Amino acid sequence: MTDEKLIRGIGRWDLTAVVINCIIGAGIFGLPSKVYAAIGVYSLLAFIACAVIIALIVLCHAEVASRFTATGGAYLYAKEAFGSAGAFEVGWLYWIVRMSTFAANCNLLITYMGFFWPAATGPAIRIGLIAFVVVLLTVVNIVGVRQSIQLTNFFTVGKLLPLLLFVLVGLFFVQPSNFQIGPAPEYTSFTTAVLLLIYAFVGFEVAVIPAGEMKEPQKIIPFALFVALAVVAALYILIQVVSIGTLPGLAASERPLADAAANFLGPLGAGVIVVGALISIMGNLNVGLIGGSRIVFAMGEHREMPAVLAKTHEKFRTPYIAILLNAVIILVLTIQSSFLSALAIATVTRLIIYATTCLSLIVFRRRPDAAPAKYTAPFGIAAAAVSIALVIWLVTNVDFTKEGLPIIVVAVVGIVLYYLFKIFRKSAAI
């Protein structure tokens, strides 16, 4: 199987921008207050813990990704390491995560628009705005990956500038007296805070999915992953420092960055942060559509979903059927849903998918016929083992009824669909 019917238009710094855009989403605009309410100034340690956990997982992704040039990401790695059934389950879970996350973030986008235009949250205007956003991003993605990536680069710059302004100006207004170190948090509180914060660091995996549209993906993926994670981790920690140091009522804030900015930049500063949030969410929506559609495209190529999903546009050479399918489902989900507290479910599901990629590193290292790695992770086996152990630690601390059960149900549905497709393929060509 080859991806050469797709245009390889994504370069090193393009991909770095994509990774940053994927990671920095709506989470960082709301989570600083949530983790501070849970564990106080120890939230800074939680940010560092998250950065270390994700760094280990990224290390595994970088090596595994360097073995492939095709589109598919974790789905493709699982297919080579564990076979079709495991790959379908990974692809299915990830597709569900991407669509539901898009729907939630799109609703959040409308909520933020309401800061400047209260009528935006009205039923009719809300539906119209949702449709406009989905159609706009769909057209951009169908017209070409180059145009989509250029839009992503714009969103990356647009979201980083307000955040950098927040940090660079806010550091001069930090009050050391706000950093009161109390008793160490309880184990469960710290674990919950870390799991909550992981959401702010996820999304990097979207960047490795469209490898078939990258220039020298085996070289640029490791570079982009490490550079982007370093930038994001440093920025997040500084954001938390400024939030704690400038906003005494941080624990009770619903818009912590906007409220903190209002303290040292005035109402205009709060408005700038809201604009940054809008740009950030739009950027995530764009790369989410890229990642979600490419997962379905890859599954269509492997005949684990209808082959029509692998069709590419004759002129633009983009997987337009997969993009359109994602757009239609996303539109319906977004209109009929709201921005609910599904953060833990999405995070836990992603962590499970990450664990499969870490496990595949061990499998490929021990398989003599595996494609050679263009990047070898230092202490790769140990990093993979520790990553898997950390995922198990986090996953076993979730509420089974609220998060565990829904994930199990979705996973079982995926298994049923896999065997239904398998039976159908035997009786007729898809």
Annotate each PLM feature.
Residues M1-S33, A37-Y42, I54-L59, T71, ...:
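Membrane-interface "cap" regions at the ends of multi-pass membrane proteins
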Residues L151, A184, V308-R317, Y354-E403, ...:
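C-terminal membrane-solvent junction of multi-pass transporters and transport-like membrane proteins
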Residues I110, A124-F173, A184-E186, L225-A228, ...:
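Membrane-interface loop-to-helix entry segments
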Residues L76-Y77, G114-A119, F226-N286, E304-S341, ...:
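TM-loop-TM module centered on a large, flexible mid-protein loop between adjacent transmembrane helices
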Residues K34-A38, A46, A55-V134, T138-I142, ...:
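Hydrophobic transmembrane alpha-helices that form the core helical bundles
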Residues R8-V19, G83-I96, L129-V133, P185-L197, ...:
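Select transmembrane alpha-helical segments in multipass membrane proteins
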Residues Y112, F116, V135-V139, V167, ...:
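Alpha-helical transmembrane segments of multipass membrane proteins
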Residues T2-L6, L44, A120-I125, F154-V275:
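Helix-loop-helix junctions that connect adjacent transmembrane segments
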